[in-house]
Amino acid sequence: MNGRRTIGEDGLVFGLVVIVALVAAVVVGTVLGHRYRVGPPVLLILSGSLLGLIPRFGDVQIDGEVVLLLFLPAILYWESMNTSFREIRWNLRVIVMFSIGLVIATAVAVSWTARALGMESHAAAVLGAVLSPTDAAAVAGLAKRLPRRALTVLRGESLINDGTALVLFAVTVAVAEGAAGIGPAALVGRFVVSYLGGIMAGLLVGGLVTLLRRRIDAPLEEGALSLLTPFAAFLLAQSLKCSGVVAVLVSALVLTYVGPTVIRARSRLQAHAFWDIATFLINGSLWVFVGVQIPGAIDHIAGEDGGLPRATVLALAVTGVVIATRIAWVQATTVLGHTVDRVLKKPTRHVGFRQRCVTSWAGFRGAVSLAAALAVPMTTNSGAPFPDRNLIIFVVSVVILVTVLVQGTSLPTVVRWARMPEDVAHANELQLARTRSAQAALDALPTVADELGVAPDLVKHLEKEYEERAVLVMADGADSATSDLAERNDLVRRVRLGVLQHQRQAVTTLRNQNLIDDIVLRELQAAMDLEEVQLLDPADAE
């Protein structure tokens, strides 16, 4: 692999050093990003670039196929699980125009630009496919403060467009390796088959997992099923030559929809904790690896024809085309959508110019593009070196760096300039859900208490507790009685938190005196942990 080491070739010790360095960089970069209000991907790329300057770290290379087959399903699954199925359905037209139309338009524009600036034609086509999708992790990390509809469109686009881009990538790489070209009609047919097959695979896996989880009430086994789900969906679709990305998305949306009725609370808490940590480390590590590749990409380009100046001009030109294509597409499709709505006499959703600017500016590229670039084969079918492979990796690295550093850091300023209306829908829906939940508790209490044979005095105590919660949820916060009740409950909450700390100290002291075992300590600690989490984030104190 051009003299470069993979992680395992220098032995387990060096591999462990790499893992420790990666995790440390992810943790430090994320903490600093939150503290100084800088998008964590920005600092992670910079920290990766510094690691890449260290000789042995600079030689480490992650296989692009590993990212596409191991990391991508996990990332897409968790992002899909945190995306609103209803919002995707309501904004499906816009998401499809972005995740298919914009991907193809970007691929064509980048390919033409690269070819015009001297890149080999097949390599230019591959570069266009690699840079065509936005990145789900980048959007989630850098655009999370956007209003719900704008964020849903960006998230939905970034989840689905990987499928479109990977089809383009497979076709362009195959042609570059020596396969016969493919016409527009055949390409459209491949897209249709890929998406329909991916949808069917996702529905099948999602349905099977739902049936299994209805019959299993064990957090560990359900957690294992949760881990297997994205990979099963991805592999099934890939084996059918269909979109694994779409299969993962569909399986996740199926489980998102049926989850509240088939997944138990303990299993949900455990699975969410696992996926939070796993995707945090995967996403962060991939951003660090983006940075690690930059010094090596510069070294490789410096020794080729035209050297670094030519490659830099090409990379900056391609970056400009990527950004400009997105801006033009957002403006054009908005006008087109309004025209179609008027023709069909449908209500038109008004999207102001400033809001369109925010959407246009949020087209970050990320680790998926880098993984695709690294997955470009070293040679063609004839044994000749793959044309401009190092140049592809360099250009992709620069585009990722510029979009994340420039667009990512300036996006908050653009959002403030846009003066986007406050998203009150989420708060209204949250209030509606809490009100209905509180009323349901009051209505159900007599029936449940009667079924369990609860004593009348205990029922009255529970009724008072639920009524107080309902008052806080339903009443106007400006009401003096409600305000007094809220203040009293907050004081009770703080007292309970303080008492919990003394309980912990007492139990820990017993363990330190060898009067109880560590297992007993952990059992009590688990119960106190749950109580503390509830007290730290109470529903009626938000």
Curated annotation (Swiss-Prot):
It is a multi-pass membrane protein. One of its GO terms (biological process) is potassium ion transmembrane transport. It is found in: Cell membrane. It comes from Mycobacterium tuberculosis (strain ATCC 25618 / H37Rv). PANTHER family: SODIUM/HYDROGEN EXCHANGER, SODIUM_HYDROGEN EXCHANGER 7. InterPro entries: Cation/H_exchanger_CPA1 (IPR018422), Cation/H_exchanger_CPA1_bac (IPR004705), Cation/H_exchanger_TM (IPR006153). This is Uncharacterized Na(+)/H(+) exchanger Rv2287. NCBIfam families: a_cpa1. One of its GO terms (cellular component) is plasma membrane. Coiled coil: none annotated. Pfam families: Na_H_Exchanger (PF00999). Disulfide bonds: none annotated.
